[in-house]
Amino acid sequence: MSTPDVVREAQSTEAYNPLAKQKAAAKLSRIPIKVEQGEVLKKPEWIRVKAGSPTTRFYEIKNILREHKLHTVCEEASCPNIGECFGRGTATFMIMGDKCTRRCPFCDVGHGRPDPLDKDEPLNLAKTIAALRLKYVVITSVDRDDLRDGGSGHFVECIQRTRELSPSTQIEILTPDFRGRDDRALEILKAAPPDVMNHNLETVPRLYKEARPGSDYQFSLNLLKKFKQLHPGVPTKSGLMVGLGETDEEILEVMRDMRAHGIEMLTIGQYLAPSNSHLPVRRYVHPDTFKMFEEEAYKMGFSHAAVGAMVRSSYHADQQAHAAGV
């Protein structure tokens, strides 16, 4: 399936403030593609989410996060499952600020020149995890192409501080690709490897130029393969979105590539456009197709596959890890 609503254009020459956090149209105005909306597809009946309410832990979690000056990808990326996850007392923590150095047009995380790293963040994160008595946490980050190590050292500090205060808590990290710094980053991560190493491929290679400008499909596969070679006992994990214009066979081919690179855990979920400025949804995948992807995943040898319309990379990550034997 082609993507006719994504066309080339020259970068915007409008003045902008690189220090400000840019979202939606402001964020995407300077990438070398223009996102044009075609027909807006009606959401099918199987797309349903729960909103947080005052009777859940939703606001309690938000207050604790603000108190410790922390961000969650749940909030920054406008995850549709935020109500359910916050209500269950779980969250995916996003470290190194809330401004990403990339401008992926599917993602709702803000772009801008990042602030200096907060030296207190690792301890604040550890205190928050301890206060919430979390048994399984996911730590992710914005891309930090401005840092010589891509932020890997900060990941290590967060893991170490968390294990000091919560030694029984299992830690999954969802990392950027450490573009051009992968060997350095992997060497640094040796000091405190996580319990699960996650890096998302996001989409099929044909759509990388539109959906993941600045990223490389093979580079991402190799990052996980190299990590697995260094830490054979640590499960590796990756995730895909469907609905950007890919075909079912392209998804299956990516799954085969994942297994060929030693990736053991898989997530596949429906892409939902955060705004009209983002890449449009080209199709809503039927539950039967998700079921087919799941069945094929286990045939290929994945230890665990979380596949469904509302599945996200860190959605029920604890249950995914435990089902995979972590």
From Swiss-Prot:
Residues noted as binding [4Fe-4S] cluster 1 in the record, renumbered to the chain: 74, 79, 85, 314
Superkingdom of origin: Bacteria
Co-factor requirement: [4Fe-4S] cluster
Cofactor note as given: Binds 2 [4Fe-4S] clusters per subunit. One cluster is coordinated with 3 cysteines and an exchangeable S-adenosyl-L-methionine.
PROSITE patterns: RADICAL_SAM
GO CC terms in record: cytoplasm
Catalytic reactions of this protein: [[Fe-S] cluster scaffold protein carrying a second [4Fe-4S](2+) cluster] + N(6)-octanoyl-L-lysyl-[protein] + 2 oxidized [2Fe-2S]-[ferredoxin] + 2 S-adenosyl-L-methionine + 4 H(+) = [[Fe-S] cluster scaffold protein] + N(6)-[(R)-dihydrolipoyl]-L-lysyl-[protein] + 4 Fe(3+) + 2 hydrogen sulfide + 2 5'-deoxyadenosine + 2 L-methionine + 2 reduced [2Fe-2S]-[ferredoxin]
Pathway this chain belongs to: Protein modification; protein lipoylation via endogenous pathway; protein N(6)-(lipoyl)lysine from octanoyl-[acyl-carrier-protein]: step 2/2
Pfam short name (any one): LIAS_N
Subcellular location: Cytoplasm
Every Radical SAM core domain range: 85-303
Record-listed [4Fe-4S] cluster 2 binding positions: 100, 104, 107
PANTHER family: LIPOYL SYNTHASE, LIPOYL SYNTHASE, MITOCHONDRIAL
Family named by the database record: Belongs to the radical SAM superfamily. Lipoyl synthase family.
Record's protein name: Lipoyl synthase
Species in which this protein is naturally found: Acidovorax ebreus (strain TPSY) (Diaphorobacter sp. (strain TPSY))
